[in-house]
Amino acid sequence: MILGDRDLKYYLEKGWIKIDPLREDTVRENGVDLRVGGEIARFIKTDKVFDPDNPDPAFFKIEKIEEFIIQPYEHVLLTTEEYIELPNDVMAFVNLRSSFARLGLFIPPTIVDAGFKGQITIEVVGSSFPVLLRRGTRFIHLIFARTLSPVEHPYQGKYQGQKGVTLPKFRTEASKFLSLHQK
């Protein structure tokens, strides 16, 4: 069941869904708009090979921003201004606001799992022309869906509690894989 604006306001009022800071104008008909936060990570163009088993943060440049230009076809990680907390029976779909999609910007399909807490880091792919983005601009739209029952294992993954832009974390996955297959 997708939560409409009345449901969302009720869940927010009861504290079942937490969004901080929450602005009233961001609660929409069937979701909540989240805003561009104050930090991005640009992907560094290189011929070096990225190895997920030995991640190197030198592939990214983290910048504190009030505004930034996403260049044509550039890939950028950005964080939301808001910190969210979801209960064990609510998940969210992350969508780019249509005004930005109509400019040619793109984000990959992204889900926020039930039980997640943190700021959302999202990948944005640039358009065919440069686009200026400012901190505080409503940028992504979360559509919340209630599960039929609380999930058995709420999200407790490597991105739980993240604040600011968070780079990809692969080492844990590689370590888990190796530990499972070396027995």
UniProtKB/Swiss-Prot annotation:
<dbReference type="InterPro" id="IPR036157">
    <property type="entry name" value="dUTPase-like_sf"/>
</dbReference>
<keyword id="KW-0546">Nucleotide metabolism</keyword>
<comment type="similarity">
    <text>Belongs to the dCTP deaminase family.</text>
</comment>
<dbReference type="GO" id="GO:0006229">
    <property type="term" value="P:dUTP biosynthetic process"/>
</dbReference>
<comment type="function">
    <text>Catalyzes the deamination of dCTP to dUTP.</text>
</comment>
<dbReference type="GO" id="GO:0006226">
    <property type="term" value="P:dUMP biosynthetic process"/>
</dbReference>
<dbReference type="InterPro" id="IPR011962">
    <property type="entry name" value="dCTP_deaminase"/>
</dbReference>
<feature type="binding site">
    <location>
        <position position="113"/>
    </location>
    <ligand>
        <name>dCTP</name>
    </ligand>
</feature>
<keyword id="KW-0547">Nucleotide-binding</keyword>
<dbReference type="Pfam" id="PF22769">
    <property type="entry name" value="DCD"/>
</dbReference>
<feature type="active site" description="Proton donor/acceptor">
    <location>
        <position position="123"/>
    </location>
</feature>
<feature type="binding site">
    <location>
        <position position="155"/>
    </location>
    <ligand>
        <name>dCTP</name>
    </ligand>
</feature>
<comment type="subunit">
    <text>Homotrimer.</text>
</comment>
<keyword id="KW-0378">Hydrolase</keyword>
<dbReference type="InterPro" id="IPR033704">
    <property type="entry name" value="dUTPase_trimeric"/>
</dbReference>
<dbReference type="GO" id="GO:0000166">
    <property type="term" value="F:nucleotide binding"/>
</dbReference>
<protein>
    <recommendedName>
        <fullName>dCTP deaminase</fullName>
        <ecNumber>3.5.4.13</ecNumber>
    </recommendedName>
</protein>
<feature type="binding site">
    <location>
        <begin position="97"/>
        <end position="102"/>
    </location>
    <ligand>
        <name>dCTP</name>
    </ligand>
</feature>
<comment type="pathway">
    <text>Pyrimidine metabolism; dUMP biosynthesis; dUMP from dCTP (dUTP route): step 1/2.</text>
</comment>
<dbReference type="GO" id="GO:0008829">
    <property type="term" value="F:dCTP deaminase activity"/>
</dbReference>
<feature type="binding site">
    <location>
        <position position="162"/>
    </location>
    <ligand>
        <name>dCTP</name>
    </ligand>
</feature>
